[in-house]
Swiss-Prot record:
The keyword Hydrolase applies. It catalyses: ATP + H2O = ADP + phosphate + H(+). Its EC number is 3.6.4.13. Induction: Expressed in the late phase of the viral replicative cycle. Residues 110-262 form the Helicase ATP-binding domain. Belongs to the DEAD box helicase family. DEAH subfamily. ATP binds at L123, N124, T125, G126, L127, G128, K129, T130. SUPFAM superfamilies: P-loop containing nucleoside triphosphate hydrolases (SSF52540). A motif (DEAH box) lies at residues 215-218. One of its GO terms (molecular function) is RNA helicase activity. PROSITE patterns: DEAH_ATP_HELICASE, HELICASE_ATP_BIND_1. This is Putative ATP-dependent RNA helicase QP509L. SMART domains: DEXDc.
Length: 509
């Protein structure tokens, strides 16, 4: 990208000015060369060709913010180098939006047409960020690049674009597609690319796009990923996130420097009834002891040891069978239920295969007809993703599942391993806008009472209470891996409640 700094005046020492800029500005920029040129009929200009980002205290920040004082000092005006953009075909297509979505579309559209065309949308999981962004694409009619973190989200974007804007030419940009042909904005109207592939592209690849959409923008925090900001300093950038200020490592500020403060809309009125089954599990002494590395408790190693307990694996299988058997014969106050779609979350990949084998054996009779259990993780095939949309049980890692995975038929969660962070996004997997709100949402939370990780449950309680989900406690052990004796420990309608014999809906046996 070429930025032009214009100046006019009498008696300006051009060489001194050039030297001053090189000293004061160049020390912040990763790459900077200043060349003089004269434009016919115009005052002299200084052209700065650079990577459009500078380094300051280890952070990468949108450069005009820092340079503004330099411009004011020399009475300069910053203007972006003009780029000629082709217009997308204009076809009258309409797709329904909720009122809150339409209000946000109007607000984003106005902001993106302003000189500093950046908008950071904060909208809770499942409330239609993708649909809002597609509406913006339709209104602006510029070649658009959508940057996503995973293949699953890429496929969801492409499916949604083809459904809502069928007249546009849409392409997936990944390593496999690029080996077959060169995918550019000349051949396609919207390109949906995975960050790991796009960050390797040179800056000229990005210049023909009139809009960049960053889905799951809070994920662009790693030293490799946020270098993409050096290359996409275009006129219009839209960031999307359900949790823009929720990173425990404090790296949110990196994204805020580029996109500005997140803007959120009024929450919709749709609510989902649900409850939490908190199982206090007393594991075998051989598996609950903390694992220390360098004299500190290692959460990952401790979780790995917890899941070596065969009774704990059986507990998850039993809870899955319990949810799988739920039907409509439940008290009216809990809504109308049908067989549940179940998501099982684990901490890391090798545990997925352990649970997959256990569940596949348990459900082998029904899997003859249709795969009931699906396993999703990084590098998953398109076939596996397609099968997951019809599976009743999906196995995910927390890291993979928190990133915008959309399965509207999923209504319950089993947290097979302890978790503290990203709970808003995890619960959002079963509270997506447009799914059946009549179905009761159920969260099964296993608390390892003898493990040092048991205290994490109180962080999860905070999110459950925010959702208004009653919390029922029950118990199980390595000697008896079947949960029983539910006791209500928190009621949103009676917050002083500490314990009660009230029980949640009982599954059919």
């Amino acid at each position: 990208m070429e930025a032009i700094i214009s100046f006019a005046g009498i008696g300006i020492n051009y060489k001194k000015l050039q030297s001053k800029l090189q000293h004061d500005v160049g020390r912040f920029l990763r790459a900077l060369t200043i060349t003089a040129r004269a434009l016919p009929g115009q005052p002299k200009h200084i052209a700065i060709r650079q990577e459009t980002a500078f380094t300051l205290q280890g952070e990468y920040i949108y450069f005009p913010i820092l340079l503004r004082k330099q411009f004011e000092m020399f009475n300069m005006v910053y203007t972006a180098h003009p780029v000629s953009l082709r217009a997308l075909p204009c076809v009258e297509t309409e797709f329904p939006l909720f009122n809150y979505q339409q209000e946000m579309v109007d607000k984003i559209h106005k902001k993106l047409l302003s000189p500093y065309g950046r908008f950071y949308l904060h909208l809770n999981t499942g409330l239609g960020k993708t649909r809002i962004a597609i509406s913006i694409i339709q209104k602006l009619l510029y070649p658009t690049l959508v940057i996503v973190p995973t293949k699953a989200i890429q496929i969801q974007w492409i499916d949604e674009l083809k459904l809502l804007l069928p007249h546009l030419r849409v392409a997936a940009y990944n390593n496999a597609a690029c080996k077959k042909k060169d995918i550019t904005s000349k051949e396609y109207d919207v390109i949906v690319g995975i960050i790991n592939t796009l960050r390797k592209k040179p800056e000229p690849f990005f210049e023909p796009f009139g809009l960049v959409v960053l889905d799951e923008a809070h994920e662009l925090h790693s030293p490799e990923n946020y270098k993409i900001f050096w290359k996409i300093q275009l006129s219009r950038i839209l960031g999307l996130s359900a949790t823009p200020l929720d990173r425990p490592d404090g790296m949110d500020k990196i994204i805020l420097h580029h996109l500005g403060q997140p803007q959120r809309t009024v929450s919709p009125t749709t609510t989902f009834s649900g409850y939490v089954r908190e199982i206090e599990y007393q594991g075998h002494p051989d598996f609950v002891k903390p694992v220390c590395i360098n004299e500190k408790v290692s959460a990952i190693a401790t979780i790995d040891k917890l899941l070596q307990d065969p009774s704990r694996i059986q507990l998850v299988v039993n809870e899955t069978k319990r949810l799988y058997s739920l039907h409509t014969a439940e008290p009216q106050k809990w809504g109308t239920n049908e067989p549940y779609g179940i998501i099982i979350f684990v901490e890391f990949r090798k545990l997925l295969e352990i649970f997959y084998q256990a569940l596949s054996e348990e459900f082998k009779d029904v899997q003859i007809i249709v795969p009931e259990v699906a396993l999703l993780c990084g590098g998953v095939s398109n076939t596996a993703l397609s099968q997951a949309h019809s599976a009743s049980i999906i196995l995910l890692t927390y890291g993979y599942g928190r990133r915008g995975i959309s399965f509207k038929h999923m209504t319950s969660i089993i947290m097979a391993t302890p978790r503290r962070n990203n709970m808003e996004q995890i619960l959002g997997r079963i509270t997506r806008q447009g799914s059946d709100e009549k179905k009761v949402r159920i969260v099964v939370d296993i608390k390892d009472t003898l493990s040092p990780l048991s205290s994490q449950v109180y962080d999860r309680h905070r999110i459950y209470k925010k959702k208004g989900y009653p919390i029922f406690k029950c118990s199980a052990s390595y000697q008896q891996p079947y949960s029983s004796n539910e006791v209500l420990i928190w009621d949103p309608y009676n917050e002083s409640c500490l314990a009660s014999t009230t029980t949640p809906p009982s599954p059919s046996k």
